Amino acid sequence: MKAPHNIFHTAGFGKVAPWIDLANSEEWDGFGNLTDHLANPRWLASFLKHWNLHPLPSKDVPSRKLVQLRVLLRRAAEKVAAGGSLGQREISNLNQALNVPVRQKLVQNQNGFRAETVPVRSDWTWVIARIAASLGEMLANHAVERIKVCANSDCRWVFRDPTKARTKRWCNDRTCGNRARVRRARAAQKQKA
């Protein structure tokens, strides 16, 4: 029996942080075709499960709030990737998303004790806060210069640049990088002709 197709992992999600996956949930395939993964309940369930965001009833999905957060995260990524910084509006909106009641819980495991922040209520506001917090954590850990947006204008995938020199331009050199090189070569040939 063939294993079920996991649209979350095969599409390249789940590698860095939940905020990046949500920002990329509106996916351009590199040829100008758009897929809105937030509209797919299977993708959303895989996203929540992968990032250990408590499974919630799918009938209660706050689609509008998730789309607003996606727009905010993408705008933040584009500003930071262009060398700018977040404006007061973005910071205020992120802080608003982060404003959920939490409590500390002491947890013991084989390595000893640790304090854990847990929600007062496990609901969608907590999920939204955790997604927004993942961007805050990346910014606070001085990983700002690693946040990039694919240079392919038909893709615009948000990614974390893992290279030492932080010079990566494309989300995937084999796809978007090759397309860019082919376009440049064709444009050069056209100019010569």
Residue ranges of each PLM-predicted region?
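BZIP DNA-binding basic region
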Residues: 126, 130-193
